[in-house]
């Protein structure tokens, strides 16, 4: 573990004194949701981080910071649209690994559409991860 930490410290583009910062963004990608907003509510192990009612094209963005001396943040969100609900983890770190597949740009991007929830780390290649039930 010490060896891994020292090696990581020598990569300045990924480390600051405050830690490594990741962008988490959830976008309402509906094309025809009329007067029904997409409602999102998120929490972390530290408590409630809040929610929003998103109209078409609106987004909910926050940042997670990883550091060697603080607990690793994990977030869970509930999406509600009409009568459908989805719960998912937009940012989760498995012990000894990097967060999800957030990539070298450190972005966890989510696009919510009528048929489900899509993930990307570069805002161009989207992979469907969850379907509305």
Model-derived features with residue positions:
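Intrinsically disordered, low-complexity segments enriched in small/polar residues
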Residues: 1-73, 78-133
């Amino acid at each position: 573990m010490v060896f891994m930490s020292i090696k990581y410290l020598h990569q300045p583009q990924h480390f600051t004194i405050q830690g490594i910062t990741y962008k988490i963004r959830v976008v309402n990608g509906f094309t025809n949701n009329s007067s029904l907003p997409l409602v999102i509510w998120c929490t972390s192990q530290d408590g409630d981080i809040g929610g929003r009612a998103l109209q078409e094209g609106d987004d909910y963005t926050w940042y997670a910071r990883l550091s060697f001396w603080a607990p690793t943040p994990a977030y869970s969100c509930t999406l509600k649209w009409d009568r459908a609900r989805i719960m998912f983890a937009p940012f989760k770190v498995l012990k000894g690994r990097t967060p999800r597949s957030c990539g070298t740009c450190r972005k966890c991007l989510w696009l919510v559409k009528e048929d489900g929830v899509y993930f990307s780390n570069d805002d161009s290649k989207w992979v469907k991860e969850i379907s509305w039930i």
